[in-house]
Curated annotation (Swiss-Prot):
UniProt record, GO biological process: tRNA wobble guanine modification
Cellular compartments per GO CC: cytoplasm
Protein name: tRNA-guanine(15) transglycosylase
Pathway: tRNA modification; archaeosine-tRNA biosynthesis
Superkingdom field: Archaea
């Protein structure tokens, strides 16, 4: 494990960690509020009041403006912003993505960040946008690789050096880039050029980008999802192993009169009530907030409170082993987020390697829960059950079951398992009495596999009449099938 990053707790791909920097230790996952050196809606010194432990600002803006540059060189970055905690600096790559060029070299901006005392330095990489031709993505990735190799040789101080992972929307390029950077031993790994995906709500593709990048990195590496600032998607990103986010949304949205919640964004003019209990929303009514002279500042503060409240909830869910339940709740806030959730579970084999083998009670939240790592893990381990003689499978206790050699409980979305394991994780799951189609499909598929793995056993399957599914007929071909209402022990 990296000496500067310590993982304390894990759930799914998410983790609570400690990131050590020259200006203090930061607990992750967390958000870095973006500070515009020219326009500060909320002073950096007040950011701790909202829960911020680390900030991010743009070194290129400071470098290009002489009055900011001179103060930063004289007093340091922390003196310029009036913040004594860790500060990360971007290099100008954002301006490069917007304007197509910047008036600084990689070595110049690296040296400037080092001189002003940035805690996390970012090289001048090439942010290749989504959907470009493969050749362009490959060529720009090669330039980025050269710059990052030069940066690794250039920065040898105690300051942390970030190695941005690029590769556009090509998973193979993302994984290749991440694997290369892993060998260079950067301290932080930002995933770059993903803002266009988030702005277009292309969460399924974002999931693929994150997964590919993570597969190329060490599991112990801290990962920063560049430009992710809306709390509605934090849980999904954390579950995939993202540790750091940065948010300019709190200020940009406030300027446009937008009010952030974990379920989406409201325009304040359309709000009759404030669905929040932060200090701002507890003090003002919706009408008072609309008419306030400092409305932009108040909205910015609310947006920060809402952002960090979600981070705290995510951390608690990691502690409780409930992160995926939160992800499934949050991803129902928008159809495109639901696409992201479904895409996440296509990576369940990878996620299962990261997910703890034991944790809190499994809660079934909907059809997507059937694809969770716990279910996949159970399906992989069916060959561990050796069954002989007469075997009864039932959803709940039935008369005469003790006459059988072995008793199995049937519980969707798992399938059949020994009755002795009913109170053991994950079989102590909270599930609906009547399973949906996807849940039943997974459970019956696993049951068929279990029956086929034990050809010497004679199976009796007692199920509910409500179990309407084509696989029931496949069960009937391999076992004696009786509906519970018809069960009579002779």
């Amino acid at each position: 494990m990296s000496a500067i990053f310590e993982i304390l707790d894990k759930d799914a791909g998410g983790r609570i960690g400690r990131l050590r920097t020259p200006h203090g230790t930061v607990e992750t996952p967390t958000v870095m509020p973006v500070i515009n050196p020219n326009i500060q809606l909320i002073p950096p010194k007040e950011m701790r009041n909202f829960g911020a432990e680390i900030l991010i600002t743009n070194s290129y803006i400071i470098y290009r403006k002489e009055e900011l540059k001179s103060v930063a060189l004289e007093k340091g970055l922390h003196g310029l912003l009036g913040f004594d905690g860790p500060i990360m600096t971007d290099s100008g790559s954002f301006q490069l993505s917007v304007y197509g060029s910047v008036e600084v070299t990689n070595e110049e901006i690296l040296g400037f960040q080092q001189k002003i005392g940035s805690d996390i330095i970012v090289p001048l990489d090439i942010p290749t946008p989504p959907d470009v031709h493969y050749r362009r993505a490959e060529e720009e990735l090669a330039i980025t690789a050269e710059r990052l190799e030069a940066a690794r040789k250039f920065i040898q101080s105690e300051q942390l050096l970030a190695g941005p992972v690029q590769g556009s929307t090509y998973p193979e390029l993302r994984e290749k880039a991440a694997s290369h950077l892993k060998d260079l031993n950067f301290e932080v790994y930002p995933l770059g050029a993903v803002v266009p995906l988030m702005e277009a709500y292309r969460y399924a593709e974002l999931v693929d980008v994150i997964a590919a990048s993570k597969k190329g990195l060490s599991p112990a590496s801290p990962v920063h999802l560049f430009g992710a600032g809306h709390p509605m998607m934090f849980a999904l990103a954390v579950a995939m192993g993202c540790d750091l986010f940065d948010s300019a949304a709190y200020a940009l949205y406030a300027k446009d009169g937008r009010y952030i919640t974990v379920n989406g964004t409201y325009h304040v003019e359309k709000l009759n009530y404030l669905p929040c209990s932060c200090p701002v929303c507890s003090k003002y009514t919706a009408e008072e907030l609309k008419k306030a002279d400092n409305r932009e500042e108040l909205l910015g503060k609310h947006n920060l409170y809402a952002t960090f409240a979600e981070i705290r909830l995510i951390k608690q869910c990691i502690k409780d082993g409930k992160l995926l339940e939160l992800v499934e709740q949050r991803c129902r806030a928008h159809p495109k987020l639901l696409d992201g959730l479904k895409k996440l579970y296509t990576h369940s084999s990878w996620l299962e390697q990261l997910d703890p083998a034991t944790k809190g009670t499994f809660f079934y939240c909907g059809p997507e829960s059937s694809s969770r790592p716990e279910i996949l893990r159970f399906g992989k381990r069916l060959d561990r059950f050796s069954l002989q003689g007469s075997v009864i499978i039932r959803t709940g206790s039935v008369k005469g079951e003790k006459d059988y050699d072995q008793i199995l409980t049937f519980k969707a979305p798992f399938g059949a398992f020994p009755v002795e394991m009913e109170e053991v994780y994950p079989f102590n799951a909270e599930v609906p009495k009547f399973p949906d189609y996807e849940s039943l499909n997974t459970a019956l598929s696993n049951t068929l596999k279990l029956i086929d793995l034990n050809p010497e056993a004679e199976f009796t399957f007692i199920c509910e009449e409500e179990f309407k599914h084509p696989l029931i007929e496949e069960i009937r071909k391999r076992a004696k099938l009786v509906y519970r209402k018809d069960w009579k022990k002779e």
